[in-house]
Amino acid sequence: VVLDGLNKSLASEPCQDNKGIGKMDKLKWLSMVLNMERQYTIHESVIAELAAFYREAGYQMMLLKGYGLSKYWPIPNHRPTGDIDIYLMFMNSEGKDKSHPAWECADKLITEKLGIQVDNSHHHHSVFTYKGIMVENHYDFVNVHSHRSNRWIENEFKTLALTRNEEYTFDNGAKLLFPSPLLNCLFVARHNAIHFAAEHLNLRQLLDWALFVEDRHKDIDWNYFWKNAKKMGMEKFVLCMSFISI
């Protein structure tokens, strides 16, 4: 993203006296970008395959963060990839055993059909590796085990996931769900706040927030957002992210 910005800037205001980017530095950056684009293509293909697999088995796959947020970047495949975060819901919950939620049934299916071992040692998601990429299958949006106060947030997020979402179709016809703009705004802000409190906030996470809000701000109920942001204790943090992003 830095190289994209510099290329745009240098195109309109070329550096004088050969004070631009050194040739070797630019070649190094270009190599990194080409690798990033290759990884993004692989990432996209794996997500589409998983979405098709789950849909055929009767599950709707909601994609959290990552690939969905890359769609708001000026050049989507220049957003670095990471693991794949998903949240699964039954396409038809009638007759389903409520003691075995969608994520649990889907993990069993992954093992039975694909022979993939699933790690269930984590607090609010299971983990497995599909074609070399780590997948986190979330049964919670937030970790309700770490703080009891997170439970009302979890209920809020799950209600929004069930009642409001956006469908996305890949070129191969596979379909998945993205969170609604409101849920995305709350979830990404909360995720960033937790990361900042625990360790740090990196440039990619800040750009995810800034570019998403810039594009979808008209689709967000801001009264609802700020009411819940205050209740979650992250109002000042969100204001700081917004101020830095301007």
Regions found by a protein language model. Give the residues of each.
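Conserved NTP-donor binding/palm subdomain of two-metal-ion nucleotidyltransferases/polymerases, i.e.
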Residues: V1-G82, L88-I246
